Amino acid sequence: MLNQLQSLTEYVGGNNALIDQWLQARKQLLVAYYHLVGIKPNKEALSLLDEEALDNFCQNLVDYLSTGHFHLYEKMLHEAATHSEQLLALSTQLDFALQSNTQQIMTFYDNHLATAIDHDNCLEFQQALSSVGETLEERFTLEDNMIRLVYDN
């Protein structure tokens, strides 16, 4: 996911300050996720759950989702509307898919990430965390498509 982000950053970087900030927020979210799941350079084994890493990831996650829905998507839809009806229609479809994706992530958050972790639900938590990663990957693909759609036209 970081490679995909790097590619997009190189593609649109510097052309729009809002998009640049958004992509930087995505990078922070990914780093927080990787830290939480134990993906670190030069690390040999997974460690026990780091509560601070969980808190950091959850905060980054909620901030990222909020920024997308309450600031960026609306601006991108407005930008799409200035180009053409077809572009607006495609962007609106992506926006609906992103809303559904947000709902999935928030369900994971409410059911697994926001609750205390103990030995009884550790495996369930790890599975939920993996699902969140997969859902984030889907989200980033949708967002990348929206960015490219709007900024290629």
UniProtKB/Swiss-Prot annotation:
Gene Ontology BP term (one): regulation of DNA-templated transcription
Organism: Pectobacterium carotovorum subsp. carotovorum (strain PC1)
Subunit structure: Interacts with RpoD.
Name of the coding gene: rsd
Keywords, in A-Z order: Cytoplasm, Transcription, Transcription regulation
Gene3D superfamilies: Regulator of RNA polymerase sigma(70) subunit, domain 4 (1.20.120.1370)
Localization in the cell: Cytoplasm
Entry protein name: Regulator of sigma D
Recorded GO CC terms: cytoplasm
Source taxon at top rank: Bacteria
